[in-house]
Regions:
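Charged, low-complexity intrinsically disordered terminal segments
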Residues: 1-186
């Protein structure tokens, strides 16, 4: 697996859009915030164009995080498949923190070969006024992010939405290690 670390939103967005525009089979996009600004529209248009080329497109976005975004922005044409993660979850009423959480992940997987993960939401603000360290994975490590998306999609899809095939877990040998901001433990 080839790993690329980004430090600027403009750079990672350019690469993400390039991957979407080069997709041949399937795109899996999961995001927390997706602004209806020029950059958000560029992502939306790239997904629509991919779908028109015959690429399967699956999108998950968080309903609560996008309350200020006009819902018409998320009216993506069929056959794009969309899950709007619910604004209110059952755990809120029962004061169960584990069942009231948000979908805060930001994942893009293209053709099961290229994956991006990090903290950037989709929006022009994040391109120039935000700092994060997203990563692009090209190769077998992208499968882990694909599997994470597939599991989430299948657990949250409506009955009229397609069930994504679960390819099963694969052996993954991590080359990067994430650790808390404290002494690492082995």
């Amino acid at each position: 697996t080839t790993t690329t670390v980004f430090t600027y939103g403009e750079d990672v967005y350019r690469e993400m859009l390039g991957a979407i525009r080069g997709a041949r089979r399937r795109i899996l996009l999961e995001t927390y915030i997706w602004k209806a600004d020029a950059l958000g529209e560029e992502f939306k248009q790239a997904l629509v164009e991919a779908s028109e080329r015959g690429v399967e497109v699956f999108v998950v976005y968080d309903g609560f995080a996008n309350l200020v975004v006009p819902q018409t922005f998320f009216d993506l044409p069929e056959p794009i498949h969309v899950i709007r993660y619910p604004v209110f979850r059952p755990g809120v009423l029962m004061l169960n923190v584990r069942k009231s959480g948000r979908d805060h992940r930001k994942i893009l997987v293209v053709d099961d070969e290229i994956a991006f993960v990090g903290g950037y939401n989709i929006g022009a603000l994040y391109a120039t006024q935000w700092r994060d360290t997203p990563v692009r994975l090209v190769g077998p490590s992208a499968w882990e992010l694909r599997d994470a998306f597939v599991d989430f999609w299948n657990a949250n899809r409506a009955s009229d939405q397609p069930l994504l095939a679960d390819p099963g877990s694969v052996h993954w040998e991590p080359r990067l290690r994430a650790a808390r901001n404290a002494q690492a433990h082995r």
